[in-house]
């Protein structure tokens, strides 16, 4: 299967969808071909909804096996759909684009360095993870700058050696591979162009063969 995908010609698939280990959340208007390819490549159930009445689900939603973290501006009908599949933590207006400011797996969550200590504690308690406030390549929106699973983290190519070393020390887990790369012909906003879990991945359709190779290497798909 071709490991690339677009949504109506837009390669920034991570802006519009959020993938978990057994579930993917996509916009209501996503074409059947888009939904079907995600279901097959990542071996997930696909649910359709909006968040805040918007299709930019990847920016507004994240989480791990313990539940969803989502913008506090989510509508009641949208929240009810998510709650059918897991518990939900709603972020307040201070920094509510959860998928933009949180990068998480089942062990740790890297968060925007300006996130308040109260919000960090709330996220840590809900997801049962260690909190790591950081930025990469000088960018604090870690949820869209990076991508991660329980076994790997892909950082933008312009991440500094100091940033990489700090993340390695903070995670302190030899079973989690850390590497750098890009998507969509050099974009450092990796999360905007990559949907990934332990079973597979899909990258934006502008992603080059070299970039696909880096993804497969870091996440162990080779």
Curated annotation (Swiss-Prot):
<dbReference type="GO" id="GO:0003743">
    <property type="term" value="F:translation initiation factor activity"/>
</dbReference>
<protein>
    <recommendedName>
        <fullName>Translation initiation factor 6</fullName>
    </recommendedName>
</protein>
<dbReference type="InterPro" id="IPR002769">
    <property type="entry name" value="eIF6"/>
</dbReference>
<dbReference type="GO" id="GO:0043022">
    <property type="term" value="F:ribosome binding"/>
</dbReference>
<dbReference type="Pfam" id="PF01912">
    <property type="entry name" value="eIF-6"/>
</dbReference>
<keyword id="KW-0396">Initiation factor</keyword>
<keyword id="KW-0648">Protein biosynthesis</keyword>
<dbReference type="GO" id="GO:0042256">
    <property type="term" value="P:cytosolic ribosome assembly"/>
</dbReference>
<comment type="function">
    <text>Binds to the 50S ribosomal subunit and prevents its association with the 30S ribosomal subunit to form the 70S initiation complex.</text>
</comment>
<comment type="similarity">
    <text>Belongs to the eIF-6 family.</text>
</comment>
């Amino acid at each position: 299967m071709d490991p690339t995908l677009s949504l109506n010609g837009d390669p920034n698939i991570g802006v519009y969808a959020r993938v978990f280990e057994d579930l993917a959340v996509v916009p209501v208007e996503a074409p059947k071909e888009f939904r079907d390819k995600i279901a097959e490549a990542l071996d997930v159930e696909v649910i359709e909804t909006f968040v805040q009445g918007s299709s930019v689900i990847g920016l507004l939603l994240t989480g791990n096996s313990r539940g969803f973290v989502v913008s506090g501006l989510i509508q009641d009908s949208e929240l009810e759909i998510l709650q059918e599949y897991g518990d939900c933590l709603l972020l307040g207006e201070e920094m509510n684009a959860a998928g933009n400011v949180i990068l998480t797996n089942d062990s740790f969550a890297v968060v925007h360095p300006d996130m308040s200590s109260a919000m960090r504690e709330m996220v840590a308690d809900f997801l049962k993870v260690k909190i790591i406030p950081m930025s990469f390549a000088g960018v604090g929106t870690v949820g869209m700058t990076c991508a991660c699973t329980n076994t790997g983290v892909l950082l933008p190519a312009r991440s500094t050696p100091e940033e990489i070393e700090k993340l390695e020390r903070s995670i302190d887990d030899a079973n989690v591979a850390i590497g750098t790369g890009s998507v969509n012909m050099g974009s450092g906003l990796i999360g905007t162009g990559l949907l990934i879990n332990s079973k597979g991945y899909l990258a934006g359709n502008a992603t080059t063969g070299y970039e696909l190779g880096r993804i497969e290497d870091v996440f162990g798909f080779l």
